[in-house]
């Protein structure tokens, strides 16, 4: 019965007039700036001087009836609903919204510097995003999608060693190994040396499936090849094949205090829980849909009411990163989307053509 009702609502979804769209956009734009419910009187004063207050009030009543705006008990004005924000982001957002010259200059300055890897570049770029949006941002990446560039085995002591994996984005991944009486360190080092020779530029997630071919080569060098591969080597690389590792780092949490929504402790806790929710960042990092620009997801899509995220995926040779701005549903979506789109385009253009990661 509930599904039938939803289907009926979808079928009779009203088609908004141009004036109703303009009223809805004006309400959202005004509420984004002031965080105060918007009245018909205010709209007439600011945007609709050629219309009567009764006309605008009637349009607002229809928008409320259709579910695009709603009344808050603390005021006679109206605020956007999730449905209203969704319609705005799909149909009314200013797609030609430009970023400031200051932002462009600061980003290009970062991209012109010599950093050791892509993560250092994006860390610096995200700090500008934080400052400009006054919101926190999360950078995510999946190590399993990176390529192997080098692998070394370092002996720590008689009982332990460390596998060092250098990836295509110049990150270093480490795995501890216990050395027992059956382990000859030199033989084990031979195993990893052959991997270093044969599997450079292979995705970490695919190495495990290629080890059976490599063991035949190692067998010609050491007698216990099967033992070392089954007990040690496979354990290192099965990790990337069966459990993709997603790393996320949050920047700019301090800016939360600048938003009135988070004076409500429950809403603040909800956002902090979202930032710590590894599940959603894993879904974002492992999302294979790399086409297009920044995507916006509202609270009902991410399981956190009153919150929203805007995500851009940075695609570079052999690696990618996701930058996600997190905040209340009362975000400046046009501005945030423009910033993320510009960041994505410039980083991919400059780093994609000049670096091999």
Curated annotation (Swiss-Prot):
Top-level taxonomic group: Bacteria
Pfam families: HrcA, HrcA_DNA-bdg
One GO MF term: DNA binding
Keyword Methyltransferase: no
Biological process (GO), any one: negative regulation of DNA-templated transcription
Keywords on record: Repressor, Stress response, Transcription, Transcription regulation
Entry keyword Repressor: yes
Disulphide bridges: none
Family: Belongs to the HrcA family.
Function: Negative regulator of class I heat shock genes (grpE-dnaK-dnaJ and groELS operons). Prevents heat-shock induction of these operons.
PANTHER family documented for this protein: HEAT-INDUCIBLE TRANSCRIPTION REPRESSOR HRCA
Name assigned to this protein: Heat-inducible transcription repressor HrcA
Organism: Ureaplasma urealyticum serovar 10 (strain ATCC 33699 / Western)
């Amino acid at each position: 019965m509930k599904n039938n009702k939803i289907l009926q609502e979808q079928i009779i979804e009203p088609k908004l007039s141009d004036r109703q769209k303009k009223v809805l956009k004006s309400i959202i734009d005004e509420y984004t700036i002031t965080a105060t419910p918007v009245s018909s009187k205010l709209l007439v004063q600011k945007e609709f001087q050629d219309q009567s207050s009764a006309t605008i009030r009637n349009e607002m009543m229809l928008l409320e009836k259709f579910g695009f705006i709603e009344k808050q008990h603390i005021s006679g004005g109206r605020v956007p609903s999730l449905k209203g924000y969704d319609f705005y982001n799909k149909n009314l957002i200013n797609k030609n919204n430009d970023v400031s010259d200051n932002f462009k200059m600061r980003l290009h300055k970062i991209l012109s510097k010599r950093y050791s890897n892509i993560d250092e570049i994006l860390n610096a770029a995200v700090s500008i995003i934080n400052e400009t949006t006054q919101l926190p941002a999360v950078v995510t990446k999946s190590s399993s999608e990176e390529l192997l560039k080098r692998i070394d085995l370092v002996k720590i002591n008689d009982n332990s060693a460390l596998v060092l994996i250098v990836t295509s984005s110049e990150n270093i991944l480490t795995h501890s190994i216990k050395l027992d009486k059956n382990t000859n360190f030199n033989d084990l080092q031979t195993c990893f040396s052959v991997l270093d020779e044969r599997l450079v530029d292979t995705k970490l997630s695919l190495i495990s499936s290629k080890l059976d071919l490599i063991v035949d080569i190692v067998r010609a060098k050491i007698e216990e090849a099967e033992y070392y591969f089954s007990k040690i080597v496979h354990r290192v690389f099965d990790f990337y094949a069966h459990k993709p590792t997603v790393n996320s780092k949050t920047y700019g949490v301090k800016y939360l205090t600048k938003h009135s929504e988070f004076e409500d402790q429950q809403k603040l806790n909800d956002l902090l829980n979202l930032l710590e929710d590894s599940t959603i960042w894993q879904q974002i990092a492992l999302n294979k849909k790399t086409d297009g620009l920044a995507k916006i997801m509202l609270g009902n899509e991410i399981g956190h009411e009153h919150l929203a995220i805007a995500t851009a995926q940075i695609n570079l040779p052999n690696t990618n990163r996701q930058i996600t701005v997190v905040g209340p549903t009362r975000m400046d979506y046009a501005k945030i989307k423009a910033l993320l789109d510009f960041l994505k385009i410039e980083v991919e253009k400059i780093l994609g053509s000049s670096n091999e990661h």
